Swiss-Prot record:
The keyword Cytoplasm applies. InterPro entries: KH_dom-like_a/b, RbfA, RbfA_dom_sf, Ribosome-bd_factorA_CS. It comes from the Bacteria. Keywords: Cytoplasm, Ribosome biogenesis. This is Ribosome-binding factor A. PANTHER family: RIBOSOME-BINDING FACTOR A, CHLOROPLASTIC-RELATED. GO terms for molecular function: ribosomal small subunit binding. The gene is rbfA. HAMAP family: RbfA (MF_00003). Residues 128-147 have a biased composition (Acidic residues). One of its GO terms (cellular component) is cytosol. One of its GO terms (biological process) is ribosome biogenesis.
Amino acid sequence: MAKEFSRTRRIGQQLQQELAVVLQRDMKDPRIGFVTVNDVDVSRDLSYAKVFVTFFEEDKDVVQEKLNALIAAAPYIRTLVAGRMKLRVMPEIRFVYDSSLVEGMRMSNLVSQVINSDKAKQQQFGSVDDDVIENDIEESDDTEGKV
């Protein structure tokens, strides 16, 4: 029977927490800016860790520059995190941009725009009264029985 939380998953969770702290407190590179560590996938042999990060930037060039800065600093970040974790071998860190959070925010904004547009159209053309809708429903019920 497999364990509910495997060792690789536990190490991934701890690595995510330590990376977040290191990136927030210890990294002084202005090119990186504010970065969020969304998830960490650790390989089964613990030799590689794929770190999914998000930047709150919409410009793809700026995001790529920040990601390149993180990739260049990966060995230094690995050293800092290794000092905070008690592992025999520290996984090699590979940073990957995760656009799911930004896409989710974009979709939420689109839904909000549609809702606001609908409200504006209702105000412009007048809203339909509930009484009119109820009368239409009653009339359709009456006509269904007379077929």
